[in-house]
Each structure stands twice: as C-alpha cells, then as structure tokens.
C-alpha cells in the first residue's frame, strides 16, 4: 500500500527583524496595559451607543403589535378622559402635573408600573415633558378622546341650534342633565361645543359652562370668598340680585396674531362721512403723539357706518341709512391698521330705533304693545335672543369685512329712567325666561364674547360710571359680573356727569373726581376672579354744565394721571363726539407725557 505523501510545509523560522517587532509589541502591551483596557472600554461604549440610536428611538404605531406580531416598544396615542386634563406621575407615582386630554403622546410598553391593579406607562407628552400615565387615560383611537356621555349645566346658557351659526335655542338652567351626542373640537382639553340632546332636540353648548357631575355643576364658586361678597348685596334697584350672577373664573383671550397693547391710548372717531373721509388727518395727528389706538363707530344709534350685510337680514332700515359706502368705510379702517394702530369697532347694542321700526315685536313696549320711546330712543329688549343674534352677527361681519382687532359694545344695558313704567305695570320687556336684567346682560356678553373669540378678536363693554358702586344698577349693569366675562371693561366717569354737591362742582376738579371714582372701580375689579382690562373713557370736551369749563391738556392729563393713581392702568379713550382736530391738538402735551 502506497503511503500518503505529506505535502504540508513546516513553519519557517522567524527572521531577526520579525522577532524584534514582535518583542517590541509585547513590551508595549506589558507597559501600557491600562491604556489598552481604556481603549477597549471606549470601543464597547461607542458600540452600545450606536445600538441605542439605531434601535431605541420611538417608532409610533397605531397598534401594539408590528407586522411580525411582536409588541412595539413605543406606541403613538392620545390622552383620553371625561375631564379636561389628567394627572401624570413620577417613578414613585407621586403626582407631578397634569396634561390636557387630546394631547398626542408616545408611550413605552415595556416601562410599566403597577399599583392597586392599575398599570402606569412611561409616556412622552412632548420633547420636554414625560411621566407615568394610567392605562385608562391612554387610547390609540382619536374618536375616543372625550369620555363623557353626560354633562351638567354649570352656567345657564341658551343652546346653539348649530355649531357654526348664531341662532340660539332653549335656555338650559343650572344643574340640567344633558346627554352628549358628540362634540366639535378641543381647546386645551376643554370641549369647545358639546352636541347634546335636550327636549327632544339636539343643540350645542360650550364646555366651559358644563361640569361632569351634578354636584360640581351646582356647587357655588366661593374660592377666596368671591361669591360671598356679592351674595349679600341683594337687589335694591330692580336690576337683579348680585348673587344670581356668574363669577366662575374665565380664561381671558390672548391672540398671538392680534396683540392688544398693554396700555391703549385711544382716539374716538364717529362714522360720519366727514370723519371717515378725512381719516388721514387723524392718523397724521396720532402718529405725532403717543396715541396707539382708534375707536371707530360701526353704528351709534341711528348713525350707521356702512351698509353691512347683517342689516339686510335683521334691519333693512339701517342698511338704507348707512352714512358711507362699504368701500369708503373699509378704506378708512385699512388706513388706520396699515399705519400700525390697534383698531376697535364700537357699536351700540340695546338702543336701536331702526331695528325697532323693522321689528316692533322685539321692542320694550307699553302694556298695549306699542314701543316705548325712552331717553331719546326706542329700545330692543335685551331679554330677546333674536336681538342678541343680530348684534353679534353685525359684530362678526365687521371683523371679517373690516379687520377690527376688538369689538366694543356700548349701551349694553336696559334703559334707565323706567321706574314710572315699572311701578305702574305699563311696560313689557318680553322676558321669556323670567331673568333679571343683570342676568340678561351678563349672558349676552358671554354669548358675544364666545362668538367673537372664535373670530380671533377681543371684546369690550362700556358701563356707566355709576357701576363702580356696590350694587346692581336698575338697568342691569354690575361691574364685577361684566368684568369677569369680557376682555375689556370701560367705565364712563365724565366729571360733568357727576352730581354737584352744594357749591362743589366735580367737573372743576377732574383729578380728584376721577381718582375717587377709579379707586372704587379698582375695588370692583378685585371682587371678580378674572377681571377684564380696565380701559376708561375720559372727558375730552368742554364741560356742558356751568361754568362750562374748558378742558385742555391740563384737565385731560389730570384725568389720565388719576386713573393710574387709582389703580386702573389699562389706558384710556378720549370721548369727543365732535372729533374736533383743533380740540385734539390742545391735548398734545398731555399725550406727550404718556409713558
């Protein structure tokens, strides 16, 4: 048998050069062992870091399983609840904050804590916030974010007939149970409008006026004694009981693309053609001072700025008597805004002879049904919701067509001087829901504010100077209740409107008169949990009472300083119905002294 031949070669002997190189490497390793170990550790750390980056980033998914049936580590979802926000916790399950329902989240399926049979997932709310969230507050179905099936009315409201329209339905009282059919959208976890069922019909109500339980809906809000202050004031003049009004805190509007000046220094302009047609002169004057805003009439009783489409539907007579064309008025407002001024549209609310001529059925009337002519005007009743719809539609159309930054409601009250009619029973307010005057005024302003906030503008209300007192006025204005609702409240404490006391004439002492008034108004501001900005009308005309004092820079400057010293720092508006440029020029030094 033939032997197998071994064809493998023996290893060749190392050359002297190779041996020296090998010895040097071994010597280096022996002398630098710690460096070698450090390099290995760094390499391992780098490899692990790369692995984390490659395999540990969130991979949002609508299911907990991937296509292979394996559980995903990171899952996208939403916060769900039957309240506007839910609590989240740290690793020891201590509550550390709240987050709004509807928030898009990513939760980690393998970072779970269990306590009392409840699972808590590590959840990322945004790039900076995270925490542990109970499993029942997490859903992957966007349609299940809102959990409530029933809500209870906290603040009486008229249901909206449609989510996208002004028409109002029935009034629902506090504590009313409303089955939820759906909703439109969320704002910071709060439902904007619930679709609810009531009286065999569906309607809409803002989530801010509801609660999830009957107990919460009927609880009296008295934090810091807010309610107690008003409950004891009663109803001395027939305008309503202060305790029956709403003082629940409201979040004031703050629009990023419509910034209200911290201090509004405002000139007033009528909608007369000679003013609208010469608006450049007022702009030129304002730009040479520290004035930063204009108040312009949309309508002032029977003085109508332009032919709004809203008039065609609600008051054709107003449309017919418009002072300017739509294009003329629009051009004037555009010039004001293009010049950089904050622009406020003023409209009178519940004194409107044109509307009454078109709709006498909604007028305050005598017992026989004839509209009453009170204080030089006919008055639509503030109890009538159709009137509310009209004024709010007019305001919204003005915002959309003209671009106003703010809408100011003047004459947002019942007429004063009605005692003789009320005492004799010869007056009909068409009070369908048996409300007080103050309730009707506050509820109108809630409705108007909600509607106009949806348009991205602020809402103001003018009130008589008398409202700085501690009572509900006979015409339904009560400062704390109004201030709690609107964005801006504007008193009208014209010194020549104050009562003379013996030989003391308040209009001869503008600083003292306004300081005393502002101090009282500031106290009313402190009596509401979410007060409005107080921007006050000042007298910018010569006194209409003996000795007919001339009001110039000294007097106007005194009024402005008194407001500040009294604690009302939201600015002012000059009331000069003539819009006299020479008169405005006389105030220049007072305006130059503004901060």
Across the structure, where does each feature detected by a protein language model lie?
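SH3/SH3-like (including bacterial SH3b) beta-barrel domains
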Residues: 89-101, 163-174
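Catalytic domains of carbohydrate-active enzymes, especially glycoside hydrolases
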Residues: 279-304, 401-406, 488, 563-571
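Active-site-adjacent "subsite" loops/lids of carbohydrate-active enzymes
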Residues: 253-274, 345-397
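Aromatic-lined carbohydrate-recognition surfaces of secreted/lumenal glycan-active proteins
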Residues: 342-352, 408, 437-474, 529-543
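Boundary regions of SH3-family modules and the immediately adjacent low-complexity/disordered segments
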Residues: 63-71, 124-151, 197-250
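Aromatic-lined carbohydrate-binding/catalytic grooves of carbohydrate-active enzymes
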Residues: 289-324, 416-423, 584, 591
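SH3/SH3-like beta-barrel superfamily modules
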Residues: 100-134, 176-208
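Substrate-binding cleft of secreted/luminal carbohydrate-active enzymes
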Residues: 486-500, 510-515, 520, 524-595
């Amino acid at each position: 048998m033939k032997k197998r031949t071994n064809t493998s070669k023996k290893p060749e002997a190392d050359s002297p050069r190779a041996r020296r190189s090998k010895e040097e490497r071994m010597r280096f390793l022996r002398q630098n062992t710690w460096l070698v170990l450090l390099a290995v550790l760094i390499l391992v750390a780098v490899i692990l870091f790369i692995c984390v980056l490659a395999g540990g980033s969130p991979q949002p998914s609508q299911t907990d399983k991937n296509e292979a049936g394996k559980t995903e580590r990171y899952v996208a979802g939403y916060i769900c609840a039957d309240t506007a926000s839910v609590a989240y916790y740290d690793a020891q399950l201590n509550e550390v904050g709240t987050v709004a329902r509807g928030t898009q989240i990513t939760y980690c399926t393998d970072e779970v804590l269990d306590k009392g049979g409840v699972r808590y997932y590590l959840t990322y709310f945004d790039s900076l916030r995270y925490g542990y969230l109970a499993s029942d507050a997490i859903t992957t179905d966007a349609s299940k974010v809102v959990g409530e099936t029933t809500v209870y009315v906290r603040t009486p409201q008229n249901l909206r007939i449609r989510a996208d329209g002004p028409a109002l339905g029935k009034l629902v009282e506090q504590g009313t149970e409303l089955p939820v059919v759906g909703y439109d959208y969320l704002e910071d976890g709060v439902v904007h409008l619930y679709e609810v069922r009531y009286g065999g019909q569906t309607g809409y109500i803002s989530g801010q006026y509801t609660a999830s339980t009957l107990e919460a809906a009927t609880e009296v809000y008295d934090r810091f004694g807010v309610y107690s202050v008003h409950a004891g004031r009663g109803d001395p003049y027939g305008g309503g009981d202060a305790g029956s009004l709403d003082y629940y805190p409201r979040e004031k509007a703050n629009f990023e693309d419509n910034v209200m000046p911290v201090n509004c220094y405002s000139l007033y302009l009528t909608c007369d053609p000679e003013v609208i047609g010469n608006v450049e002169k007022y702009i030129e004057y304002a730009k040479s001072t520290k004035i930063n805003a204009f108040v312009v009439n949309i309508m002032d009783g029977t003085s109508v700025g332009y032919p709004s489409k809203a008039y065609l539907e609600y008051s054709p007579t107003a449309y017919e008597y418009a002072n300017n064309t739509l294009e003329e008025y629009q051009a004037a407002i555009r010039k004001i805004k293009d010049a950089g001024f904050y622009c406020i549209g003023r409209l009178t609310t519940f004194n409107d002879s044109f509307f009454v001529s078109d709709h006498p059925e909604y007028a305050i009337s005598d017992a026989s049904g004839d509209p009453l002519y009170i204080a030089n005007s006919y008055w639509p009743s503030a109890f009538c919701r159709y009137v509310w719809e009209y004024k709010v539609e007019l305001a919204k159309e003005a915002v959309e067509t003209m671009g106003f930054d703010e809408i100011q409601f003047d004459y947002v009250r019942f007429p004063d001087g009605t005692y003789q009619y009320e005492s004799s029973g010869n007056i009909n307010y068409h009070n369908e829901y048996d409300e007080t005057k103050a309730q009707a005024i506050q509820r109108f302003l809630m409705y108007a504010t909600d509607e106009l906030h949806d348009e991205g503008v602020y809402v103001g209300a003018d009130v008589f100077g008398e409202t700085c007192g501690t009572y509900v006025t006979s015409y339904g204005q009560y400062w704390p209740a109004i201030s709690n609702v609107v964005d801006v409240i504007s008193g009208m404490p014209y010194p020549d409107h104050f009562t003379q006391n013996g030989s003391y004439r308040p209009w001869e002492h503008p600083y003292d008169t306004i300081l005393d008034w502002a101090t009282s108004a500031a106290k009313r501001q402190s009596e509401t949990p979410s007060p409005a900005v107080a921007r006050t009308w000042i007298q910018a005309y010569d006194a209409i009472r003996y000795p007919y004092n001339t009001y110039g820079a000294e007097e106007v400057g005194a009024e402005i300083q008194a407001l500040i010293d009294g604690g009302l720092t939201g600015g002012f508006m000059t009331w000069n119905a003539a819009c006299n440029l020479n008169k405005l020029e006389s105030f220049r030094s007072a305006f130059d002294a503004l901060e």
